[in-house]
Amino acid sequence: MLLLFCICCVFIKLVLAEVNLTFVDYAKLPPNYAELLANLIDQHGLMLFDTADVRIEAYNYLLNSITETNTDTDAYLCQLLTGQYTTDCYIFGDSVYEGPENINPSTRYID
């Protein structure tokens, strides 16, 4: 019984490690972005809010914090949310953005 409990604990730890966002390199993020990410995760690296809400909040934060939106903005957002500094980051899934009249936060990606 104890062995089964230990195996379950190890399994849970491995599963939790998969959703841990602490792999983001804070040193490469501007201080405000790192602070935003730190506020959205708990001490175990688990997201405190619904993923779509976090992504929308992070995107709005970046748009309000940067005077000129460009590919660097998208790359910073991608790094903030995924740890990857790239502009090829489908943050809202793999659906194609159909324009502002058809916004669905669960499927929209950052252009």
From Swiss-Prot:
- UniProt cross-references to InterPro entries, sorted A to Z: UPF0321
Q: Which residues are glycosylated?
A: N20
Disulfide pairs here are none
Query: Keywords for this entry?
Result: Glycoprotein, Signal
Record's signal peptide: 1-17
- Bilayer-crossing residues are none
Write out the similarity annotation. Belongs to the UPF0321 family.
Q: What is this protein called?
A: UPF0321 protein P20C8.02c
